[in-house]
Amino acid sequence: MEYVYAALLLHSVGKEINEDNLKAVLQAAGVEPDEARIKALVAALEGVNIDEVIEKAAMPVAVAAAPAAAPAEAPAEEKKEEEKKEEEKEEEVSEEEALAGLSALFG
């Protein structure tokens, strides 16, 4: 993450994001720079509009609030469970009545 932060720092102050600048920022922060990681980051950021990426990354935060509607469905589920329980009770009663009818046959 330090490498990405260094690149963002360079971008925010208007400096070019290159290997030498990244290495200098990392050393100033007390991080031992890894040349391979620096080269990979510079290559990955080549041709990328960082301002546009930051703007797009900030947008989904507002969309994340949408799933809050799920708890409103809980009462509907409770009603379904209550209906199932009532149906089970009715089935139990009808079984008891059926058994009572059989006992009447045998006296």
Swiss-Prot record:
Q: Does the keyword Aminoacyl-tRNA synthetase apply?
A: no
UniProt-listed Gene3D superfamilies: 1.10.10.1410
Query: Which Gene Ontology CC terms are recorded?
Result: ribonucleoprotein complex; ribosome
Got any disulfides in this one, which pairs? none
Q: What would be an example GO MF term here? A: structural constituent of ribosome
> What domain of life is recorded for the organism?
Archaea
Entry annotated with the keyword Amino-acid biosynthesis: no
Q: Which InterPro entries match?
A: P1/P2_N_sf, Ribosomal_P1/P2, Ribosomal_P1_arc
Composition-biased stretches, type Acidic residues, lie in: 88-98
Region Disordered: list its residue ranges. Answer: 67-107
What's in the keyword line of the UniProt record? Ribonucleoprotein, Ribosomal protein
Basic and acidic residues biased stretches: 76-87
What's this protein's family per the entry?
A: Belongs to the eukaryotic ribosomal protein P1/P2 family.
What NCBIfam families does the record point to?
Answer: ribo_P1_arch
Role according to the record: Forms part of the ribosomal stalk, playing a central role in the interaction of the ribosome with GTP-bound translation factors.
Q: Partners and quaternary state?
A: Part of the 50S ribosomal subunit. Homodimer, it forms part of the ribosomal stalk which helps the ribosome interact with GTP-bound translation factors. Forms a heptameric uL10/P0(P1)2(P1)2(P1)2 complex, where uL10/P0 forms an elongated spine to which the P1 dimers bind in a sequential fashion.
Please give the name of this protein: Large ribosomal subunit protein P1
**Species:** Pyrococcus abyssi (strain GE5 / Orsay)
What high-level taxonomic lineage is stated for the organism? Answer: Archaea, Methanobacteriati, Methanobacteriota, Thermococci, Thermococcales
| Gene for this chain | rpl12
